[in-house]
Amino acid sequence: TDEELTLTTTFFNSEDSDATIKSLTYSIGGTVIGTDKTGYTLAKSSTLDVPFKYTPTAARVFTVQVTAVVEQGNNEYTFTKTIGLDVLNADSLVYIGIDASHYNEYVSGNYKDSTGNFGNLAADHSVRTVQLNTGADLIAACSNPKYKALILTAPSRRLADAQTNPKTYSDAELKALADFNAAGGTVILAGWSDNYENYDVIQKNPAIKHMAETQNDVLKALGSSLRISDDATYDDVRSAADGVDKWRLYFSTYNTDNFLTSGVIVDADHPYDKLYTERFSHYGGASIYAVDAGGNPTSALPSTVSPVVYGHATTYSIDVDKDGKGGAGTPKYTYAANDNRLLVMATEQLEGKGLIVVSGAAFMSNFEVQAQ
């Protein structure tokens, strides 16, 4: 409520002559809320988007109808189209901020604008997602009590612009994030594998901070013992069985004691079959691990850390970009007796602070979240 939105009407002219959009009339329940008599030329064999700005003032479900009068070849035609809107009271919503100020993967980096499904799912639970386009937006959200969680996907090193100007977190941003978490805010960090750092421009420039190190700067600022590996998770066995790339993984080994897995369905007889089991999509992802008090990788998880998702028994770490990180030395963690596995998602709850969620891949992208 009381926030401007943009409704876009798309026209397509499949004829061999131009047309003129003479007017557009927007109405709700028979009441006109706006007209546009600008007059637009719709060229032959082309499309045209016409935006209309509207500010709803009440929380309700309603339908907006647009009526367009179009002239072509001395003939006038009238077309109508409707869209349903569910407007929520802005003051009663919980806010989640999504960082877009660091060429973040799936947000403003590679595969940009790919968190819409997550936003739709959140809206169903009266949660509003807000894209934070600048560092100033991110810092402001950290001190805004409306925001209960922040999501930071990996700052791209794949996008050409990101390779030219690789983004990292400023000291002010790190402090703001630490203060946000200390005040009870949830911080969600996602990594991406070093598949997407295996480029000459990166390998020849040691000054470029890798994605894992960049995200780990945040985890260090939060006081977390979790880290994202500078590696890639591969699985020769499961990828062959599924007929996909070695880094296109679907995991189904969960820690059922973690509240995030509540309600997840796993059929022990069909753990890899999506018809029976709800699988965790992990595309092009990295593993995660814990460090001890000295900052050294350890296979012993502190009591503050709770695993969420493990790799398969056949999943392994590989150092794709050959920078000496990742690979066989990456810590594994006990899933069951005589069954140690890579960890790909975990939470950490430090005393007096908000929850920290760490994943080796962006589990909230449109490719992972299926929602209407």
Where are these regions (language model features)?
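Structural beta-strand segments of beta-rich domains
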Residues: 3-7
